[in-house]
């Protein structure tokens, strides 16, 4: 069973996918969000879900640092509900606090240029979100 991880932003959606065993997360191409037709975002994800036989989607849940739910987290909740309805897939909201900052730090430490970092950060954040979820799942199973 494969799982997809998403870092949903206002302009892009970072995407990662697990291996068949649910051990590791790998980045996939970032989806550019459509301002004109939000359904295109869900159509792209539906195709990805179908092509990869995905059973579950882990969506980054950007809580505030004090643990409260703000505007961004509410948007993630709405996105998750819509994805469940349109793609008939189970979704999980996963605390994503500091994943983007961690992704930025890794890219800076790897001496990736600012231009390339901008393109890679959403994908890497999605990998961090999904890998965190997978690690927790394997830890609770042992």
Curated annotation (Swiss-Prot):
Its EC number is 3.1.-.-. Disulfide bonds: none annotated. Gene3D superfamilies: YqgF/RNase H-like domain. One of its GO terms (biological process) is rRNA 5'-end processing. InterPro entries: RNaseH-like_sf, YqgF, YqgF/RNaseH-like_dom, YqgF/RNaseH-like_dom_sf. It is an enzyme of class 3 (hydrolase). NCBIfam families: RNAse_H_YqgF. Belongs to the YqgF nuclease family. This is Putative pre-16S rRNA nuclease.
